[in-house]
Each structure stands twice: as C-alpha cells, then as structure tokens.
C-alpha cells in the first residue's frame, strides 16, 4: 500500500472482510507498504469499489516478479487464513474518539470487542487472537495527567474507578492489580496471542 492506495485503512478492512468469507490472503510485508495479495474474486473487487480501495489485477508474470522482489529485499509474506478475533484493552468509560485504534478499526470496518481489567483477570484474553493496547499505564500511578489534572473531576473519578476495580479483584492497591494485569498480558503473548 504505497502512495497509489486511495485508502490504506479501508484496505485493512477489505482484508478482514475477505477473511470473513473464508478466503486466504497473502500479506506482503514491506512490499509497497504492506500490500495484500488476494485472489481475484468478484466479491472482493466489488467490495473494493464500494469502499474506495485501490486494487490492481495482476497476471502470472507480475506475480513471479513480486515474489522475486520480496525474496531479494527486506520483505516477507504472511499467510492470513482466518479472521482474527480482536480485542481492545480499554476502560469501559472510554469514548470511541478517545483512542486512535478504535477510530481506525471503526473506519476500516474491522470487528472488535473491548475488554478491561475484569475480563483480563478472569482469563478472557484467551478468547482473542489479537489484543490492541495503546499507551497504557500499568504502574498503578493513574496515568500521565496527574500533574496537570489531578484536581479535575474526571481524573478523580478515574482514580476512584481504578481503586474500586483493584479492590473488587482482591488486590491491596492499583499498583499490584495493574502488575497482575501486565503479567496476564505477557502470558497471553507467550502463549501465542498477538499484541
């Protein structure tokens, strides 16, 4: 997906859509910015047109040249065989516009679910193939806005929320609870989950 791609975020949505139709995809890492190679099914081409995603039909010679270029360069091919079940780690009171990941997945039309500390504590990470985090603070220090917003109502509400969750999960402090969540995420990745 180089500069010739009209809408690279929507292209990820096309890849996801294609996987929902039990059609495999080759993700061409570092080739023209990470293009997707998909068999020329009419339903894929139609969906690309609907969503405004640029696609280029290729012939066998083009395919051989692409594979050769990938083989000779700092590139690779990842075979995508099934649609991933995606989770975003985010507090339940976050708004969709509070983070770029949620905005991007909504725009790309990629399905996801949200989870937070309760679900991670209960072992729900294993239900997902892919977990998205964004700049989370697992130190138990209530985030980066203490200095500028520690007296703001929203900040105090967030602090109470964190403390309540930690207590309800049986931890003596937010610090201990967040450390346990970080370990659960580490184990999730160690067991093959994508982060």
Predicted regions and their residues:
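Hydrophobic targeting/anchoring helices
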Residues: 1-103, 108-110
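Extracytoplasmic/secreted cell-surface and envelope-processing proteins
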Residues: 7-10, 96-98, 123-124, 139-148
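A structural signal for short, well-ordered beta-strand segments and their strand-loop junctions
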Residues: 26-28, 113-116, 132-133
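Short loop/helix-cap segments at secondary-structure boundaries that form the rim of catalytic
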Residues: 46-49, 122-127
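Generic recognition of flexible, low-complexity loop/linker segments
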Residues: 75, 118-121, 183-185
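Extracellular/periplasmic catalytic domains that process cell-envelope and extracellular macromolecules
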Residues: 79-82, 123-126, 188-190
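A short, well-structured beta->alpha microelement
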Residues: 109-124
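Short alpha-beta junction capping motif
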Residues: 128-195
């Amino acid at each position: 997906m180089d500069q010739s791609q009209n809408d690279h975020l929507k292209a990820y949505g096309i890849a996801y859509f294609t996987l929902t139709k039990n059609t495999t995809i080759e993700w061409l890492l570092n080739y023209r910015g990470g293009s997707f190679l998909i068999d020329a099914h009419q339903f894929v081409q139609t969906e690309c047109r609907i969503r405004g995603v640029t696609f280029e039909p290729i012939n066998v010679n083009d395919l051989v040249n692409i594979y050769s270029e990938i083989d000779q360069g700092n590139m690779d091919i990842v075979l995508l065989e099934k649609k991933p079940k995606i989770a975003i780690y985010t507090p339940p009171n976050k708004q969709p516009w509070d983070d770029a990941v949620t905005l991007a997945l909504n725009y790309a039309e990629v399905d996801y679910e949200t989870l937070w500390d309760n679900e991670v504590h209960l072992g729900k990470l294993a239900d997902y193939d892919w977990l998205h985090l964004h700049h989370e603070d697992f130190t138990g220090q209530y985030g980066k806005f203490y200095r500028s917003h520690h007296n703001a109502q929203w900040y105090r509400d967030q602090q109470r929320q964190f403390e309540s969750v930690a207590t309800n999960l049986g931890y003596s402090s937010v610090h201990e609870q967040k450390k346990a969540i970080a370990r659960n995420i580490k184990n999730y990745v160690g067991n093959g989950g994508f982060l």
